[in-house]
From Swiss-Prot:
Gene Ontology biological process terms, A to Z: angiogenesis; cardiac left ventricle formation; cardiac right ventricle formation; cardiac septum morphogenesis; cartilage morphogenesis; cell differentiation; embryonic heart tube formation; heart development
Gene Ontology molecular functions: bHLH transcription factor binding; DNA-binding transcription activator activity, RNA polymerase II-specific; DNA-binding transcription factor activity, RNA polymerase II-specific; DNA-binding transcription repressor activity, RNA polymerase II-specific; enzyme binding; protein homodimerization activity; RNA polymerase II cis-regulatory region sequence-specific DNA binding; RNA polymerase II transcription regulatory region sequence-specific DNA binding
Organism of origin: Gallus gallus
Descriptive protein name: Heart- and neural crest derivatives-expressed protein 1
Keyword Nucleus listed: yes
Length: 202
């Protein structure tokens, strides 16, 4: 009886001990797991976290954050680790120089831009897009038989005005007759200055 009673007492004590500490043992763990579920998304926000991770050691990686999103975190820490290596800054500098060189070549392809005008990358891309659209329009009109040579130069001028209205309204303005504009703008050639002037002064 005493042994059974002792066993029952021990079992009761163990059960009480388990119930007493269960909220303490599992409560924070569950809460930590919930935080980890949101943590990988926070890590992948470059505006907030990338500068901090960039200053930390490579060991500050997925092991700190739990298993949630470990693959994405490893990829992120791997990129940061390569940047901190010996070849990282040089590779990044070469990539930047390559991009700048490509933009410089693209600027040279855009006509009627003053030599002293400095174009940002976004303005260069916008001008290039407008110029490509303009060239495609010229090619489309050149494919129509019976157009006189002088009318092509006028198309470029009138097309510049239509480009402005196209961005503000709808593309159908290209179908409007251009004979009226030919008399006013006859003799002017080249890509219309209105197009790049509009982009230079947004």
């Amino acid at each position: 009886m005493n042994l059974v009673g002792g066993y029952q007492h021990h079992h009761h004590h163990h059960h009480h001990h388990h119930m007493l500490h269960e909220p303490f043992l599992f409560g924070p763990a569950a809460r930590c797991h919930q935080e980890r579920a949101y943590f990988p998304g926070w890590v992948l926000n470059p505006a907030e976290v990338t500068p901090e991770l960039h200053g930390q050691s490579p060991a500050y990686g997925p092991a700190e954050f739990g298993s949630g999103g470990a693959g994405r975190l490893e990829a992120l820490s791997g990129r940061l680790g390569r940047r901190k290596g010996v070849g990282g800054p040089k590779k990044e500098r070469r990539r930047t120089e390559s991009i700048n060189s490509a933009f410089a070549e693209l600027r040279e392809c855009i006509p009627n831009v003053p030599a002293d005008t400095k174009l940002s990358k976004i303005k260069t891309l916008r001008l290039a897009t407008s110029y490509i659209a303009y060239l495609m329009e010229v090619l489309a009109r050149d494919s129509q038989p019976g157009e006189p040579e002088g009318f092509k130069a006028e198309l470029k001028k009138a097309d510049g005005r239509e480009n402005k209205r196209k961005r503000e309204t709808q593309p159908e303005v290209y179908s409007q007759p251009l004979a009226h504009g030919e008399k006013k703008l006859k003799g002017r050639t080249g890509w219309p200055q209105q197009v790049w002037a509009l982009e230079l002064n947004p």
